[in-house]
Amino acid sequence: MAELCPLAEELSCSICLEPFKEPVTTPCGHNFCGSCLNETWAVQGSPYLCPQCRAVYQARPQLHKNTVLCNVVEQFLQADLAREPPADVWTPPARASAPSPNAQVACDHCLKEAAVKTCLVCMASFCQEHLQPHFDSPAFQDHPLQPPVRDLLRRKCSQHNRLREFFCPEHSECICHICLVEHKTCSPASLSQASADLEATLRHKLTVMYSQINGASRALDDVRNRQQDVRMTANRKVEQLQQEYTEMKALLDASETTSTRKIKEEEKRVNSKFDTIYQILLKKKSEIQTLKEEIEQSLTKRDEFEFLEKASKLRGISTKPVYIPEVELNHKLIKGIHQSTIDLKNELKQCIGRLQEPTPSSGDPGEHDPASTHKSTRPVKKVSKEEKKSKKPPPVPALPSKLPTFGAPEQLVDLKQAGLEAAAKATSSHPNSTSLKAKVLETFLAKSRPELLEYYIKVILDYNTAHNKVALSECYTVASVAEMPQNYRPHPQRFTYCSQVLGLHCYKKGIHYWEVELQKNNFCGVGICYGSMNRQGPESRLGRNSASWCVEWFNTKISAWHNNVEKTLPSTKATRVGVLLNCDHGFVIFFAVADKVHLMYKFRVDFTEALYPAFWVFSAGATLSICSPK
């Protein structure tokens, strides 16, 4: 039966560490005692977490008894009780059957020798010599003998002065045969039987307690091991963070050095001009000073002929006032460097603020599981071999769209470009990092509308995909429900079941953004799809298959759809929808566009085909217009 030992842990509740009692199973597949799990969730409250894997449930799951596991536990407990304990397993100590030599009972007849037996009728203890009459005389034949008993008075009933030969488990006391009348509703037993029963109960309790002590020891070891794992993980992450911050400090130091050098170079340039001007002015001053001295000297001459000869020469020499040319620092350059530094500081503050915000839980309702995305089993449009063979470029983390630059215009230090190069090096070793994709997604969620418009593309509706009930106008940028069926010529890409139309161009890589104006905001949808999406039947409707993703307005309800799974969204008064498609990092975001952009829903998907903008209109008067950037 040694194989039952490892099974004991599998059949134990991780909350109470005991074998399952009325076991129930959670949706995530873990088993617990029904009472343990109910008490845990009652204290915990919403949201409800699985005590083992920490899976989150917004609503309390409906629990049912696991009858198969219950039967297995019962059979295990029966087998566990039936099997003999192995040699290396602890067993309770045996109860002493005879008094120790130090606690001998004296003979009540001679008071010298040690008693060998006690007569429960005579209520006396006898040595071997004085016990002989009980063996020889017929009068003593029915007297029960027991090993020597100390303090016989305790064996007598104080009420009836009779020997207490029975034990009442209900009142936990020994009673005589006359007391049985008062305990007729109880279940008394003989002293030997009651002693054996209690001994068996206590032995089993000790065995259970020993098992619990072992379980507690294992739990303590497990907690210590988990603490060690947490400590090692935290230390490893701290080292990684320190490395990242060291690199950021190096970038900041390099930026500071470059900016300081540019300003110093500008200072040197201006001072060099001032030095040149100073030398010119010094020479000019010397020339004027020499001319002044010559004039003063000529005025001292008394000979008129000599004076006229000298003065006529000096009179022809002209002088001009001293002129200082305009020389200033390049204030535009200095202001640009200073403003770029302020912008960088503000960007850092915003990034630090986002880091300090509480992280959303894993059960984010505004996010779709990429595992639910599959290829359509009924392709209509084939994808070229070149597209299938083409590899995705390594994802690059999106940096703020307007990072500052430093230095003179001819030698700019672009931190954004430096960040992209560093990110490209990082992604070369981890091309499919989920954490990197999550960071890029968070970066785009924090962008403003002007920043999103940097990725704007012009969407043209494809005439060959439009349903006969969809009218196209305004140079194929407006789709509406036609009052009369349109006589479009047959085409294999045309929708025949749902009033839908696709964009003309597909997108396999890169980042793309477009906006759609909704009129009437009723019975319409905006999304994306693979070119292989069905064009016929109910599965061709946007979001009702694995090849399309959309946000849909149906009466007053707004929903996100994919793979025929609906997620109800909060209502919005915005009449314009922005769609951001990031093929490289695998996500599409739907924004409600007003004065600011607000998140409606996001899907994270590892796209496998080229994607087309997709639109659905149904109700009369419903119109979708492709917007121009404003």
Curated annotation (Swiss-Prot):
Enumerate the Gene Ontology biological process terms.
antiviral innate immune response; cellular response to leukemia inhibitory factor; cytoplasmic pattern recognition receptor signaling pathway; ERAD pathway; host-mediated suppression of symbiont invasion; innate immune response; positive regulation of canonical NF-kappaB signal transduction; positive regulation of DNA-binding transcription factor activity
Annotated GO molecular function terms are: cadherin binding; ligase activity; RIG-I binding; RNA binding; transcription coactivator activity; ubiquitin protein ligase activity; ubiquitin-protein transferase activity; zinc ion binding
* Coiled coil among keywords: yes
Task: Tell me what happens on changing C50S.
Answer: Almost complete loss of ZAP/ZC3HAV1 ubiquitination
> Which pathway is this protein engaged in?
Protein modification; protein ubiquitination
Q: What is the effect of changing K65A?
A: Almost complete loss of ubiquitination activity
* Zinc fingers (RING-type) by residue: 13-54
PTM annotation, UniProt? Auto-ISGylated.
Region annotated Disordered sits at 355-403
Q: Which Pfam families match?
A: PRY (PF13765), SPRY (PF00622), zf-RING_UBOX (PF13445)
Q: Which residues bind Zn(2+) 2?
A: C28, H30, C50, C53
Q: Which UniProt keywords apply?
A: Acetylation, Antiviral defense, Coiled coil, Cytoplasm, Host-virus interaction, Immunity, Innate immunity, Isopeptide bond, Ligase, Metal-binding, Nucleus, Phosphoprotein, Transferase, Ubl conjugation, Ubl conjugation pathway, Zinc, Zinc-finger
Q: How is its activity regulated?
A: RING domain dimerization is required for catalysis, TRIM25-mediated RIG-I ubiquitination, interferon induction, and antiviral activity.
Result when mutating K112R: No effect on ISGylation
Q: What induces it?
A: By interferons.
Which tissues is it found in, per the record?
Expressed in breast tumors (at protein level). Ubiquitous.
Extract the PANTHER family matched here. B-BOX DOMAIN CONTAINING (PTHR25465), E3 UBIQUITIN_ISG15 LIGASE TRIM25 (PTHR25465:SF77)
State the protein's purpose: Functions as a ubiquitin E3 ligase and as an ISG15 E3 ligase. Involved in innate immune defense against viruses by mediating ubiquitination of RIGI and IFIH1. Mediates 'Lys-63'-linked polyubiquitination of the RIGI N-terminal CARD-like region and may play a role in signal transduction that leads to the production of interferons in response to viral infection. Mediates 'Lys-63'-linked polyubiquitination of IFIH1. Promotes ISGylation of 14-3-3 sigma (SFN), an adapter protein implicated in the regulation of a large spectrum signaling pathway. Mediates estrogen action in various target organs.
* Name of this chain's protein: E3 ubiquitin/ISG15 ligase TRIM25
